[in-house]
């Protein structure tokens, strides 16, 4: 899809800085995008492309993950929220006046990611009850689930992160997840990059993470869930139990620069960015 013509000039200096001609957005003409660290690589590349093509001024940030982005959207701080989860009832209750309008841009999988020595030591697949036991610190050594004699260290995502919500739904359904365990081998982390760094540096570590974020990192592996591996086919079919859609969300129908941005991401050029970062495209989901 060809993006519309150029817009007036302005200045910008925060976040992922893309300066040039101004798009409809904030008071200074800047289009502001924030939220999910999973969606961020696609949005950042799309912002760069639109800067190069028509000089739009755009910031892309990741404050607070998916829930943080949705809150900023409804507070009028940003124009587009990146979300790696559907808009939840809790989001609507928090901001009842917000007209959440999601645009799906692709599909991702959340994996239960372990260190390579755990995977090679025999932990290739886990059941939901085993994952629950691990994250609740009732299972504390990998030998209890067929792995090496190695203590488990859990890195869980902070509340409000899309990845955390996908894991909680898989493990607990509609029930509330229990509070974090009182354990010195459990820690809360934020974005995907931080999670990956912690997993790589901690023996016996495990945590939920987008499977695309471990591509090119041989020190990490995604275990199968109930015997189902996360592949393009199982993600598209929904057979993999922690598949999730990726969204760009606006407050009401997108207009002006926000519409230009959304149109680009769902265009052929934008979908190539989705594929580049390891996510399934809309065409792949359509079969």
Regions found by a protein language model. Give the residues of each.
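Exported/periplasmic ABC-transporter solute-binding proteins
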Residues: 22-67, 71-74, 78, 83-85, ...
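Secretory targeting and sorting signals
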Residues: 1-25
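Short acidic (Asp/Glu) patches
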Residues: 94-98
